[in-house]
Structures are given as structure tokens and as C-alpha cells.
Amino acid sequence: MTATPQEIQDGLAEILEEVAGVKTDDVAADKSFTEDLDVDSLSMVEVVVAAEEKFGVKIPDDEVQNLKTVGDAVSFIQKNN
């Protein structure tokens, strides 16, 4: 079953809270991982690994740099789920 964008965003919010201490209420599609949510590069690697496991997708290293916002990640995961 394919997850809805909201389910993916909620899952990412849980991951961001666990990995980087981001409040789930602060996670929105238009939020930048680095600028708005203060996720550093090391934490981003952990977020990607957790998202791959949670959603059963592979996010190539060269694709990670294109995932600038939560919405970018949601779109990628939904397209590749």
C-alpha cells in the first residue's frame, strides 16, 4: 500500500523528532531541513536512513542534496514508494 503525502510527512516528522529533536508541530512541507529545522548534515544522513527503512525506499546519495524541504522528501518518497 502506498502511503499518502500526509502519512509520509507525519512519518518524517516522527523521524525528525527522534533524530534531530525537531518538534513534530514544526514540520511542514515548505520547511527547509537546514534553514528552518536546523538539521545538520550528520543528522540528515540519519533521517535518510530512517526514512529508507520506514518507507521501504532507496534514496541515493546524489539525490539527498536535492531534498531541501520536507515537501521535496515527501514527493520523492511517494514517487519511489
Q: Across the structure, where does each feature detected by a protein language model lie?
A:
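C-terminal structural segments of small proteins and small subunits
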Residues: G71-I77
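Glycine-rich loop motifs involved in handling phospho/adenylate chemistry
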Residues: A28-D40, D61-T69
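Phosphopantetheinylated carrier protein domains
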Residues: M44-N66
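Thiotemplate assembly-line natural product biosynthesis machinery
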Residues: T2-D25, K79-N80
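Helix N-cap/coil-helix junction residues
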Residues: G21-V22, D38-V39, V57
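Hydrophobic recognition helices of helix-based DNA-binding modules
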Residues: F55, I77-N80
